[in-house]
Amino acid sequence: MAKQKIRIRLKAFDHSLLDQSALKIVETAKTTGAKVAGPVPLPTEKDIVTILRAPHKYKDAREQFEIRTHKRLIDIISPSPKTVDALMRLDLPAGVDIEIKL
């Protein structure tokens, strides 16, 4: 797997959980001898939803809710087969979405 790169994008609503997962991935890749670039923080997405508080009229009474999606990017440069094996066996929390590109 010479001259290849693995790009890992992580998404989560909880930034502390996301940082812990990114740290696990970086440590695992470094122990197998691969070069690691990151974790790079990507822009946070904010989804804002506005709803009416009252059931009938009173359009001025509104409430806003938001959910933030935090993202991180990790590049693993020149991974070995041991690196790929270790990443496949890695156990990460359920609240983290992982997208891997080779």
Curated annotation (Swiss-Prot):
Kindly state which keywords UniProt assigns to this record, in alphabetical order: Ribonucleoprotein, Ribosomal protein
A GO term, aspect molecular function: structural constituent of ribosome
Instruction: Name a GO CC annotation attached to this entry.
Output: ribosome
Q: Which SUPFAM superfamilies has this protein been placed in?
A: Ribosomal protein S10 (SSF54999)
Q: How does it assemble?
A: Part of the 30S ribosomal subunit.
Q: Which domain of life is it from?
A: Bacteria
One of its GO biological process terms is:
translation
The protein's organism comes out as Clostridium botulinum (strain ATCC 19397 / Type A)
According to its UniProt entry, the function of this protein is described as: Involved in the binding of tRNA to the ribosomes.
HAMAP family reported in the protein's UniProt record = Ribosomal_uS10 (MF_00508)
Question: Which SMART domains does the protein's record reference?
Answer: Ribosomal_S10 (SM01403)
What is the name of the protein in this document?
Answer: Small ribosomal subunit protein uS10
Q: Which family does it belong to?
A: Belongs to the universal ribosomal protein uS10 family.
